[in-house]
């Protein structure tokens, strides 16, 4: 029987989570976190209106972390895909990264959609109408192909256009379910697509995966300074959360005419783009993916852009990025994706 969001008695998303203390004021900038071991006792807590509340709240490690670690013990590499701003093509890039890794028949790939309130991965992967099946051992991912599986809240909606209007604890509970109860099996790569910004979903994924280890994050941006501004915040978040940064990708970097293959600069980099930012921040620049209208078409139809349009310069750029991500994780480029 497929799990449903309308069956809270069967799937209690909040049950595994410890109750967060009810604060009387917003958390200050350097707050250690109301559920941390230092809550209410750290130097930064002095003078905070929440100090007594946090100090008396129950503390301790999450008892489900060992279960998550055991479930993911057969996953070799875990990659987070992040973006500071929405609309830069992060989820689109996540699908192409997944298709790129799975183009190697010797690799098995999982794609987890943690954008709980805006799940678009199933549509892009062509499995929007599928549902999750449960077994005695957990939830089965929806398999796009023999070596590419997907998990998303979209599969659990009674109607595909239903809005998911959840606060943080319930979203965190579902993300924990995705990591603890999904039968990912033996994966070479688990790609985690996240919502824009640095919100509850990012904090939850990082805390749940810290024990099992994350290889790193791939940051996606466009050339404009308004996008780079938020990517700088994402870089700061990764460093504060001790998430390794595999590199940055500049998406929509130029426009490729599907007819003549000529590339034009539509979104010009006003301040040097992602390449300059990567140099300033001393992080790897993974590559620039040009804007090809057929990428959007492939996502609308749930097709692999890499398979449908192998002659596109964007396809070559994506394949190169896939190899570079593998190299940043210590793999050989040809081992990740052999040259055609």
Curated annotation (Swiss-Prot):
Keywords: 4Fe-4S, ATP-binding, Cytoplasm, Iron, Iron-sulfur, Metal-binding, Nucleotide-binding. [4Fe-4S] cluster 1 binds at residues 31, 45, 48, 54. [4Fe-4S] cluster 2 binds at residues 257, 260. One of its GO terms (cellular component) is cytosol. GO terms for molecular function: 4 iron, 4 sulfur cluster binding; ATP binding; ATP-dependent FeS chaperone activity; iron-sulfur cluster binding; metal ion binding. Its main location: cytoplasm. The keyword Cell wall biogenesis/degradation does not apply. GO terms for biological process: iron-sulfur cluster assembly. It is found in: Cytoplasm. Its cofactor is [4Fe-4S] cluster. Component of the cytosolic iron-sulfur (Fe/S) protein assembly (CIA) machinery. Required for maturation of extramitochondrial Fe-S proteins. The NBP35-CFD1 heterotetramer forms a Fe-S scaffold complex, mediating the de novo assembly of an Fe-S cluster and its transfer to target apoproteins. Heterotetramer of 2 NBP35 and 2 CFD1 chains. PANTHER family: CYTOSOLIC FE-S CLUSTER ASSEMBLY FACTOR NUBP1, NUCLEOTIDE-BINDING PROTEIN NBP35 YEAST -RELATED. This is Cytosolic Fe-S cluster assembly factor NBP35.
